[in-house]
Amino acid sequence: MHHIFVSPSGVRSIWLRNDLASSKQRLAAMEKLVAEQGILLTDSQVAALERKQDDDLAHGEIETAHPGYLGSQDTFYVGTIKGVGRIYQQTFVDTYSKVAMAKLYTTKTPITGADLLNDRVLPFFAEHGMGVIRMLTDRGTEYCGKPETHDYQLYLALNDIEHTKTKARHPQTNGICERFHKTILQEFYQVAFRRKLYLSLEELQTDLDAWLAYYNNERTHQGKMCCGRTPLQTLIAGKEAWNEKVTNLNLI
């Protein structure tokens, strides 16, 4: 039996040739093998992959496989309406298709965070024969607290939705919602508040819903998955990947 010795520099040169120089690249390659070939991993490999996925999300590096794979949620302060008070927007963006949903509230609490999902998000995905697997939020009190008593976290658990939080003290890492908030501020709120004096939350919500319908159904995007399509077109096109995943899970 011949023993072959490979020096550390030799190992590194092999890694470099195969784009495996960093541990992150090696974990990504392992992740790809699991997705493509369904190979079985050891407990330590599974733990390493889970740490990588959570770390990527926490630092704003989002990999998304299909609609519903990862939803991004955030709170946006809209402003004040006389006679109503402070207005907060709960925002949801599907990181794959960029389909966006939003609802207005006068408070920001765990209940309002859960209400957006219950009233708008999950019914929409159910209507399209899909669900939501994981949510990405910052560490605000409306999204984080004691899991056993926190309304938002209880709602996620009740619906079997995983929860990833952005890196502490770096709320900007939830970049998907940040970009959407800039868009909605410039294209909707700044225009709407110049044109109209709103007297109620319901009146503003009606106009917001009309703009969101335009955003999802007519406004094209140049993002990684959209490629010039609207968010809804991208979601419908990506439904095949969702169906394939469900089929594969049912075969296990």
Kindly give the residue locations of the regions a language model identified:
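Residues in the recognition helix of alpha-helical DNA-binding motifs
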Residues: 10-17, 211
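Short, basic interhelical loop/turn and adjoining N-cap
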Residues: 1-13
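Positions that flank functional sites
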Residues: 14, 30, 140, 170-171, ...
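The DNA-recognition helices of helix-turn-helix-type DNA-binding domains
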Residues: 1-2, 17-18, 139
